[in-house]
């Protein structure tokens, strides 16, 4: 949030967002970032950022409890159950364009952040196809489900998929097989530039899109100089992406 305030003070209106190795996280974090990046008008009027599509039973339960199925842009985030109390009031950058660096390691909440901003902001995707995890889950522990936790369940937990998310246009851009890049570029381990180096292939492409000039003869290509390097085969284990939503009180209280 402090960096957002700094960017706002400096008049930043385009951002390179590197989510290549981000497998997801909490919906709260996703909404904090989105509310910093989205147009000020969308945030001040609390427009819909994303909505959850549950089965009929959960949808009816939410409605009976008067709880919304929508996540809206906001500036105040108060969630004592996870010790979050933050404000983005002075950190709305109001980006005109986002260059999203993506790859197979981008999943779940990171895909949802980009997809949720697409109806409001120009999102340009650079890299390779993302993982394609379009579900939202609840992280359940025995302590949350029982008044008195049995000893054999002390270290027990389960991550349950409960919904599919959609953006304000009713779309899930990463469904079914991941976000498709506007510009397809593979990471090049042979060149081995540090993340953040302006010559690293994906960042270089984003900066050129933003107007940065590079010498036509290439800047320090390392491929020829390092013939002994060889890329490892891709990891075959499925990525465990996360998009975690806080469990509504009516669910945890009902189960106890």
Question: Where are each of the predicted segments found?
Answer:
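C-terminal "post-core" interaction segments
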Residues: 1-14, 19, 23-256
């Amino acid at each position: 949030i402090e960096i957002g305030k700094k960017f706002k003070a400096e008049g930043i209106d385009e951002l390179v967002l590197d989510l290549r190795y981000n497998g997801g996280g909490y919906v709260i974090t996703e909404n904090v970032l989105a509310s910093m990046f989205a147009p000020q008008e969308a945030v001040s009027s609390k427009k819909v950022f994303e909505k959850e599509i549950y089965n009929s039973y959960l949808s009816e339960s939410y409605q009976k409890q008067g709880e919304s199925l929508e996540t809206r842009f906001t500036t105040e985030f108060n969630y004592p159950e996870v010790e979050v109390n933050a404000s983005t009031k002075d950190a709305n950058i109001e980006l005109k364009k986002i260059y999203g660096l993506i790859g197979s390691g981008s999943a779940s909440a990171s895909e949802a952040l980009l997809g949720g901003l697409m109806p409001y902001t120009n999102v340009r995707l650079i890299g390779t196809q993302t993982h394609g995890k379009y579900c939202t889950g609840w992280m359940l522990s025995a302590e949350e489900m029982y008044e008195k936790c049995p000893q054999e369940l002390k270290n027990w937990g389960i991550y349950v998929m409960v919904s599919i998310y959609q953006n304000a246009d009713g779309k899930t851009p990463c469904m079914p097989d991941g976000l498709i890049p506007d510009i397809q570029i593979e990471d090049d381990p042979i060149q081995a530039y540090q993340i953040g180096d302006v010559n690293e292939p994906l960042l270089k492409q984003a900066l050129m899109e933003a107007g940065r000039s590079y010498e036509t003869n290439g800047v320090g290509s390392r491929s020829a100089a390092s013939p002994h390097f060889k890329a490892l085969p891709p990891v075959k284990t499925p990525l465990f992406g996360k998009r975690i939503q806080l469990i509504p009180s009516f669910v945890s209280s009902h189960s106890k």
